[in-house]
Amino acid sequence: DFLDYIAFSTIIEGKIFKEDFNINADFKSINPDKFYDSISADFNLIKNLYRRTFINKKKVKDICDKGPDESTFEEYWVDMGVYGSFNRGDIYLSKGLKLINGYSFLKKGFTKNYDLILDYGHHKGKGSIDNSQLLSLNRYGFTSVLRNKFKLIDFDKYKKEYDNSFRYSPNVNDKGLWINGKISTGAYQYSNGLSQSVIQAGVGPELVLGNLKNKFLDFTSFTLTPEFNYKKGFSPLKFDNFNDHSRLIFDFKQQLYGPILLGFNASLNLQNDHPEYGKFFDRKFSLFISRRAYSIDLTYNEAEEYVLFNFNIFNFGYKDYSPSF
């Protein structure tokens, strides 16, 4: 049926009783006979319990007043969340509670972010050993991530103002060479007695060149992100099984001509005792059309064999920075 070839996604964000919520829904077909089976969705409802923001060690109420680049910005917060998923990937039905603790630090050339999430939920989904098996289990545990980003070289000695020469970008690119570091850990316990835990760590470079103003090869973005893993145990559920091998993640984006950019993302298996050692996986190929007012992305996922279409609109408050084009 022709209607099976038409699909769409929607994201709804807003507030309910002054609390933040979002719904992300996919409709894989608009065929009315298959409508129920084609729907997948997840939602989050977040209530802030505590938040403190400091600029140069002074408490502030409005984070819009960050001040000059020399300012030191710090923020602490605690959120309570309710979440749920339906027919999403390897999940049939999922619901739970989470407590989110966060810390953010920003100073010129250096950022640090830390998150700790405590989670309790009930999940029904495919088994990790037998995909035909549907398991229904309670799960509790935590995940934590520490990320650091340090700018080694700044290619923007003289910061540029946004003007009518930026035809292919809605903002000024932050150019330079960074070192990104990440340490993460997590552990889950399941109601059938199984458990899993993992520690991940890695340090890698990020390079951004060009202004995306000129027509030919005026933007390059390249990131290498190694992840070295140590894992113990495994999940009985397929959807949340922690990655069990070390890998190197490549991400590359290059302007070809005018608004046309190409992108490539993939992971290289670094686990020498793994049967897929030395092979690329999760390969994605992207084509971008980037303009000041909008962008169009087409991404082909080789493993899943699908094409993702994304359309963004920018700068609703645009004030005649450039003539029509």
Feature map (PLM): residue ranges:
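Long, low-hydrophobicity, solvent-exposed regions enriched in small/turn-prone and acidic residues
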Residues: 1-325
